[in-house]
Amino acid sequence: MPRANEIKKGMVLNYNGKLLIVKDIDVQSPSARGAATLYKMRFADVRTGLKVEERFKGDDIVDTVTLTRRFVDFSYIDGNEYVFMDKEDYTPYIFTKDQIEDELLFIPEGGMPDMQVLTWDGQLLALELPQTVDLEIVETSPGIKGASASARNKPATLTTGLVVQVPEYLSAGEKIRIHIEEKRYMGRAD
C-alpha cells in the first residue's frame, strides 16, 4: 500500500469504509525541523458525490483501489445528463452536470481527445481529462501594441466560460493551450 506522499489526483482511496476519489491535493511543508509534511486532500465520495476533506502525514499508509480506465468521446447532452461513448465498444457512460461540473470548464463543444472514464466493479466513478486543452479566447481587453511576452497579465474568458490570466498581447479569437490541473495559460495553441 502506498504512502500519502505518493497519492496523485484521480486516484481512489478506500478510507473509513468509503471510496474517495482524489480531486485536489495541497502540500503543507512545516517550518519547524522534524515536523512532518502534511497533505490536505479534497475528495469526492464515489457513492454519494459529497465533498470530503482529509489531512495525512507524508508517511501515513493509505489503501488505494485499482480502477479500470476506458477512452471515451463526448456524445450528447440530455437535459442535466452528459453522455460519453466508449471508443471501443460504444458503451454509453452517463454523468450528471453536478458530477462533472469542474471538468465541464475544459471540454469544448465538440469534445476533446484522450478523455477517460474511471470504473470500479462496473460502477462509474469519474471522468478524467488529459493534462492540456486548446481553447479559444472569446472575450478579453484588446491587445496592446508593443506588449512583450514578459508584460503583465489580464483576464480572458474562453469558449467554455473558464476565465484565466493571459499575457496582454493576446486578443479575442486566438487559440491558447491551458494546463487543466492548474487552470493556467501555457502558450499559444499549435
From Swiss-Prot:
SUPFAM superfamilies xrefs: Nucleic acid-binding proteins, Translation proteins SH3-like domain
Family: Belongs to the elongation factor P family.
InterPro entries given in the database record: Elong-fact-P_C, NA-bd_OB-fold, Rib_uL2_dom2, Transl_elong_fac_P/YeiP, Transl_elong_KOW-like, Transl_elong_p-like_YeiP, Transl_elong_P/YeiP_cen, Transl_elong_P/YeiP_CS
One Gene Ontology cellular component annotation held by this UniProt entry: cytosol
Organism: Enterobacter sp. (strain 638)
UniProt record, GO biological process: peptide biosynthetic process
MF-aspect GO terms: translation elongation factor activity
Pfam families hit by this protein: EFP (PF01132), EFP_N (PF08207), Elong-fact-P_C (PF09285)
HAMAP family: EFP
Name this protein carries in UniProt: Elongation factor P-like protein
Highest taxon, organism lineage: Bacteria
PANTHER family, alphabetized: ELONGATION FACTOR P, TRANSLATION ELONGATION FACTOR KOW-LIKE DOMAIN-CONTAINING PROTEIN
Chain segments annotated as coiled-coil in the UniProt record: none
